[in-house]
Amino acid sequence: MPTKVEETGRLALRAASGEQKAFNELYAATVETAYYTATLVLTSQEDIADALQISYMKAFAHIGELEHPESFEKWLKKIVINECRNYLRDNGKHIFSTVYIGGSYDDVEGSDLTVDIAGNEELRRTLDEILSSLPEKQRVCVNLFYYEKYSVAEIAALLGISEGTVKSRLHYGRRTLERKYKRSSEGKRFYGVAVVPAVAALLAYKAGKSSAPAAVKNVTGSVVAA
């Protein structure tokens, strides 16, 4: 059985050749990932739907330029993030607050903290509150670095900022996160849970629970037709 990456690559190749059905199938296969990526930057469902529609229009218009079809989904994520950032800039809005998770992805790989997160509503709520209270311009860096596994260099190139700026946002974000988490967790049953893997587990949990609304899933026709 082909992997999702392989199947997406085949669909992208067919779409690049102009096959209409492939565009519809490619949209259906990637819209959940694209939707979650957009939620890393935008909070309004209306804004997300608009940004996704434009992102897919751009992706489909230039799909023939994609050198490696199997990398379509990763390429699409970059388009979505850039389009969401453009949307914020053009509409005079601010990026919803973000967070840095320090260390490396290996810090939590293989841990069972996702299970703890799933079964601990109080911990999830506390982490969500902390994440939403942090300074702006960090959430995107956090998710790209820690959940999406992008390197500092890749984040810098994607966001059009220096690597030093990325590192600075991550550093100060983590300090704030750790301070607020320590204060919020005192006296609670999850006191002592390491904040870095806990937030990483939360991001993975939320990604698994994230589902694109019907209004987003059903715009295929207008995207392809455009």
Model-predicted regions and their roles:
Residues C141-F145:
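A short pre-motif secondary-structure segment
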Residues E25-Q45, H62, L131:
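Amphipathic, Lys/Arg- and hydrophobic-enriched alpha-helical face
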Residues T30, A51, R169-Y172:
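Residues within the DNA-recognition helix of helix-turn-helix
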Residues F96, Y100-V108, V115-G119, S132, ...:
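Hydrophobic topogenic segments
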Residues P2, E6, A12-Y36:
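A short, charge-rich alpha-helical start-of-domain segment used by transcription regulators
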Residues E121, L131-R139:
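Short helix-coil-helix linker/hinge
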Residues Y36, D50-M57, A61, E70-N82:
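Structural recognition of an alpha-helix C-terminal capping motif at a helix-to-coil junction
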Residues G64-H68, I81-V99, Y172:
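Arg/Lys-rich amphipathic alpha helix in sigma70-family domain 2
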